[in-house]
Regions:
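Active-site metal-coordination/substrate-binding segment of hydrolases
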Residues: 64-146, 151-162, 184, 202, ...
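His/Asp/Glu-rich mid-to-C-terminal helical/loop segments that flank catalytic regions of hydrolases
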Residues: 36, 157, 223-240, 270-273, ...
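Acidic, glycine-rich active-site loops and adjacent beta-strand->loop/helix elements
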Residues: 76-78, 139-147, 169-172, 211, ...
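Active-site-adjacent substrate-binding region
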Residues: 225-227, 232-249, 402-445
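Acidic/His- and Gly-rich active-site-bordering loop/insert found
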Residues: 2-102
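Substrate-recognition/cap regions that form aromatic- and gly/pro-loop-enriched pockets
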Residues: 342-431
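Midchain, well-structured core segments that form catalytic/ion-binding scaffolds
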Residues: 102-105, 145-146, 152, 156-366
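Zn-dependent metallopeptidase/amidohydrolase metal-coordination segment
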Residues: 7-11, 344-357, 420-478
């Protein structure tokens, strides 16, 4: 198969044009101008809001004028990543694609099918003159990937439809009907550094090789968290031996990832050195046994290191006590039977950075129920406040709660069964989607999310499964035919 043979041709033609346009997150100006010019050149009602979101409205086809209005929504930006030795200027150069069996992928870069393929479906529908549909609003949001900026900045009234279909999902056959809201809770311990008496020995411990993963979508896998493990060891040693002093603790890099590695530096009386090493080895063996399924490549090291001032003892102990006490992982499971045991509420301690006089901690909380998100954040904040830290939770983003009487879910499900002879998986996701922000501003909007199969998104290995594009296109058109009257 070559690119000229890709089906549906109308969608892949639009996707090829989109991939000529640079559209890195936060630098989507060329894409905004392209969409604006495209809509106007096709004689369609086209508007750009102050955030940079674009909406293109198309009237109903003949005989469909009394159907409810459907919003189709995708994000226009893409994650720009490349192989180390591949030359590209993402602000000016096109994405070069090729067919690899049943997959479309890119030469040395991310493909941009997340969410360029959703945008392509919208443009193909807008350009058509032979597809039955009621009134439609095609919405293209900006900067989804690095902050949900477009959805966050969209004001009520920009969209006016009754139903919304988000085209940003990555597994054909799965229909998303709910997503988690999320917030970051940060904590800060302030301290003075002191010198240790003569006779102390400094040791640097490191843990690496954990699997990690996304702190929302992967939290149900119950993988090891480097911060919690290192904190657990320190708690055991500092409550067992009076003389252990903490100098450094660093772990994690991203607010939305399970930390894969970490390190600490401690000072111990010389006569405790061998005891600490023995405890470290026993602890490593125990933890490897606990996580023998999820994390099989752990690497534990402990070695001598240079002397340095330590954190004042009471602050260090309060910090370690808080690490031991703070909730981490799954907190509650969804009660809706349709969501099939999905995680509802969770917390992940994500990163810790120690500087000369501060320890800064970032954690993330998620829930599909906003009151439980409030409670989870309060629990994390209270843990650190009790330990003497300054702690606060940010504004975050709202949940999209499953709608039990959804007309759109029923239409989408029945259409899928009619076309493919099997039921789709109706599910939620324990991560944030733009639908969460839409649900806050448009509380009566009935929404679903679906899309073709993508793999290795956000990496140069990103690939789009070609046969599923036709399936999603057929499904989308059948849904539009069956939208009810006003």
């Amino acid at each position: 198969m070559n690119k000229s043979e890709l089906k549906p041709a109308v969608v892949f033609e639009q996707f090829a044009k989109i991939n000529q346009i640079p559209r890195p997150s936060k630098r989507e100006e060329k894409m905004i101008e392209y969409l604006k010019s495209w809509g106007e050149s096709h004689g369609l009602d086209t508007k750009v809001d102050e955030t940079g979101n674009v909406i293109i409205r198309k009237p109903a086809t003949q005989g469909m004028e009394n159907r409810k209005t459907v919003i189709l929504q995708s994000h226009m930006d893409m994650v720009c990543d490349k192989l180390v030795d591949y030359e590209i200027d993402f602000d000016n150069d096109p994405i070069k694609t090729y067919v690899d069996g049943e997959w479309l992928t890119a030469e040395g870069t991310t493909l941009g099918a997340d969410d360029g393929i959703g945008c392509a479906m919208e443009l193909a529908l807008l350009a058509s003159d032979d597809i039955e549909h009621g009134p439609i609003e095609c919405v293209f949001t900006r900067d989804e990937e690095t902050g949900l900026t477009g959805a966050e900045g969209m004001k009520a009234g920009f969209m006016t439809g009754d139903f919304l279909i988000n085209l940003d999902s990555e597994d054909e056959g799965e229909i998303f009907v709910s997503c988690a809201g999320g917030r970051n809770t940060t904590a800060k311990f302030t301290f003075r550094r002191t010198e240790v008496p003569a006779g102390y020995f400094f040791m640097r411990a490191q843990l690496k090789g954990l699997v990690g993963g996304h702190s929302g979508d992967d939290i149900n896998k119950q993988r090891a968290n480097a911060i919690k493990l290192l904190g657990r060891f320190l708690f055991a040693e500092m409550t067992k031996y009076e003389g252990v002093r903490l100098a450094q603790f660093n772990s994690g890099k991203l607010h939305n990832a399970i930390p894969r590695d970490g390190m600490f530096v401690i000072a111990v009386p010389h006569d405790l050195k061998e005891n600490i090493k023995a405890d470290w080895n026993i602890f490593a063996s125990d933890v490897e046994d606990e996580f023998h399924v999820t994390d099989t490549q752990m690497v534990w090291t402990m070695e001598s290191t240079d002397a340095q001032p330590v954190i004042e003892d009471q602050v260090a102990r309060n910090f370690v006590y808080a690490l031991q006490a703070v909730d981490n992982g799954i907190y509650a499971i969804c009660q809706d039977p349709e969501l099939n045991g999905m995680v509802e509420t969770s917390s992940n301690i994500a990163s810790i950075v120690t500087s000369d006089n501060e320890i800064n901690i970032v954690s993330s909380q998620r829930s599909n129920v906003m009151s439980n998100l409030d409670n989870m954040c309060a629990t994390i904040r209270a843990t650190f406040l009790l330990a003497g830290a300054v702690a606060e939770s940010g504004d975050g983003y709202p949940a999209w709660k499953m709608r039990s009487n959804s007309q759109l879910q029923k239409i989408v499900k029945e259409s899928y069964v009619r076309l493919f002879g099997k039921e789709p998986v109706m599910r939620g996701i324990h991560a944030g989607l733009e639908c969460g922000l839409f649900s806050e501003r448009y509380p009566n909007l009935d929404m679903v999310s679906f899309g073709p199969t993508l793999r290795f998104v956000h990496t140069p290995d990103e690939r789009l499964h070609i046969p599923t594009v036709q399936m999603v296109w057929d499904h989308l058109l059948d849904v539009l035919k069956n939208i009810p009257t006003v």
